[in-house]
From Swiss-Prot:
This is Phenylalanine--tRNA ligase alpha subunit. Its cofactor is Mg(2+). It catalyses: tRNA(Phe) + L-phenylalanine + ATP = L-phenylalanyl-tRNA(Phe) + AMP + diphosphate + H(+). One of its GO terms (biological process) is phenylalanyl-tRNA aminoacylation. PANTHER family: PHENYLALANINE--TRNA LIGASE, MITOCHONDRIAL, PHENYLALANYL-TRNA SYNTHETASE. CDD domains: PheRS_alpha_core. Coiled coil: none annotated. NCBIfam families: pheS. It is found in: Cytoplasm. Gene3D superfamilies: Bira Bifunctional Protein, Domain 2. Belongs to the class-II aminoacyl-tRNA synthetase family. Phe-tRNA synthetase alpha subunit type 1 subfamily. One of its GO terms (cellular component) is cytoplasm. Tetramer of two alpha and two beta subunits.
Length: 347
């Protein structure tokens, strides 16, 4: 083995150096490394054969020669690896570079829902008029939704086909999803210690109806003003001011029609001139019924008040020419992109 090994090593070294220098990728270089320095490589085989040499001095000399070869190949492979990695980085920099002169891809930014826009507009208008916003629960009892509002037990609104009742009672009270936000007005009047009361109550309401102009859930804002000597003239001024501000038309034609609501007397429905050819209802209002004051512990001989209820969806449909109420809840991105608003518009 001694003579054979001494003759093979120079040839093996030349062959290994050539293969290392010829490697064009890190994968090729790894194959060369394994063939020479791996567990089953040539150098490992030389060391295995070295065990068979009995002469200690020769074994030491041959081992030194093999070690020199191993270290040389290891160093060459490390140098080549550094070169290949640098070339790989340069290739990526040249071929995957970002051209900073190119325009950026447009970022998809969400849009504010038209109902959010209208709700904010309405709240802001009434805030400037001195109305304070209040909140209340979506699940209410019959007293706050019907009884306190002078709605008799035989009224159609109390039937199950119109109202979503819950199966379980709380404190022997029948519970339901509120059909209007007037229930928040009742709560505000019951808590009131000082006057005037000047509030708007906005939120979701629920009725068992679904078509192009009705949905089982929709949004409503109701206003209430209670003080001494409140009259219909003050109510009309408030409604006129609100509608003119909301639609941005000081010449907007508005009319009040006699109507009936169990919680107001007198009552009126308010219409605006639509497309100069017909009138369309936008809200209901009236002077608070004395029975309502009596139900919440307010002296109706001293105090009076007015109330109004506004459908947020109805206002949005009129202002932005939306024909189908159900579109508000379809969650279609294309529709929201068309009818939505930039968030900066939500003042």
């Amino acid at each position: 083995m001694n003579e054979e090994l001494l003759n093979e090593i120079p040839l093996l070294e030349d062959k290994a150096v050539f293969e290392i220098e010829s490697a064009s990728s890190l994968q090729d270089l790894e194959k060369v490394r394994l063939s020479y320095l791996g567990r089953k490589g040539v150098i490992k085989a030389y060391f295995d054969d070295l065990r068979k040499v009995e002469d200690t001095e020769k074994k030491r000399d041959l081992g030194a020669i093999i070690n020199v070869l191993r270290n040389k190949l290891d160093q060459l492979i490390m140098n080549k690896e550094s070169i290949l990695k640098a070339e790989e980085v340069n290739f990526k920099l040249q071929n995957e570079a970002i051209d900073i002169t190119l325009p950026v891809r447009p970022e998809k930014i969400g849009r504010a829902h038209p109902l959010s826009k209208v709700m904010n507009e309405v709240k802001l208008i009434f805030a400037h008029m001195g109305f304070r916003a209040v909140n209340g629960p979506d699940i209410e009892d019959e007293f706050h939704v019907f009884d306190a509002l002078n709605t008799p037990s035989h009224h159609p609104a109390r039937e199950e086909q119109d109202t979503f009742y819950l199966k379980n009672k709380i404190n022997d009270k029948r519970m339901m999803l509120r059909t209007h936000t007037s229930s928040m007005q009742i709560r505000a009047m019951k808590k009131a210690k000082t006057f005037p009361i000047k509030i708007v109550a906005a939120g979701r309401v629920y009725r068992n109806d679904f078509d192009a102009t009705h949905t089982p859930m929709f949004h409503q804002m109701e206003g209430l003003y209670v003080n001494e000597n409140v009259n219909m003239g003050q109510l009309k001024f408030t409604i006129h001011h609100f509608l003119n501000k909301f639609f941005g038309d000081k010449e907007l034609k508005i009319r009040f029609r006699n109507s009936f609501f169990p919680f107001t007397e007198p009552s009126a429905e308010v219409d605006i001139s639509y497309k100069e050819s017909k009138w369309i209802e936008v809200l209901g209002c009236g002077i608070v019924h004395p029975n309502v004051f009596q139900n919440v512990g307010i002296d109706h001989t001293k105090y009076s008040g007015f109330a109004f209820g506004i459908g947020i969806e109805r206002l949005a449909m009129l202002k932005y020419q939306i024909s189908d109420l159900r579109n508000f809840y379809d969650n279609k991105i294309s529709w929201l992109s068309h009818y939505g608003f930039h968030f900066s518009s939500l003042r």
